[in-house]
Amino acid sequence: MGCAASKGDKSESHGRNEVSSWEPPNWDKEAGRLRDAIRGLGTDEISIVRVLARLTNRQRRKLLRVYKERFNEDLATVLETELRGAAKTVVDALLYTPEMYNVTSLKEAFESKDYDTVVSIIISSRNDSLMDMKEKYFAEFNKTLEDDLSKIPDKDVRHIVMSLLSVDRSSAKKRADKEAARIRATLLFNDGDILSLLCEKVGRNQLRETLAAFLELHRINIGQFIEEKCSTLSKKAQDTLKDCVLLIENPPQYFAKEMAKADELKILRMMVSRSEIDLYYIKKEFLSIYSRQLHDTIDKQCRFDYARLLIVILELRGQYSESAKKR
């Protein structure tokens, strides 16, 4: 096919997915709201999630510092003590940095042999995030991510994921070259090696332009093309390649389709991971594909203790102003 968690990490640098957002008028007031939700008559889980979800990841870290300064308590530790079950899982997800959340999710998926989730995390992550994840995975678990990826039972899928993980796009240009895209599209048509294209050291915009040129020049559905040219691969590997293409062409559509068949934990992971990127567009794609609202599906598809908290996140992070600034 070609192609050459520690809890302390909940307060480290957010990384590259920061989306500037609403600034609370009074940080002390936000810290006080959390304090009231925690110390009131019974822990108010909805209010805790509402305070955290209206903030970006970086703003949550500031709130952790303000809470410590005002009440002389470590908020993450307090929440760890006070929360149980779904609320603890959801709040943990909100407090992790994006890269550390992915690393933790990968480890949990490996332990439960949920290789579909492993593959989804790898193929949907930006190249710079993958590089960070590889470093953090080794630092956290004293083994390489590649070591655990070798456990993926489908050898074709394993090869695809390993190949994508080995690509360094740090020098890739952001602007697409249309003429180069047309030349590369013709080469793809002739050799049928979709994985080699996916593993080229070019940016996502160039890959998207190449796929668009492929359709324009050759009038062939890329999914059908993969089935024909990769017929010796397993069905799961073919589907993985199709997912890789969809993630280049239309990431929100990929996540909308994944959420439609996911349980509450997978929906949580995807919502939190995309909450500062394109959750707004995922909602729109979901409605377009399935003619129903995502929050209605969450309400029916997830256990109540998760659904009520996931809907809060969706309402707050799924607004245009919060998660529609990157396509």
Regions found by a protein language model. Give the residues of each.
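Long, charge-enriched amphipathic alpha-helical scaffolds and associated charged IDRs
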Residues: 1-327
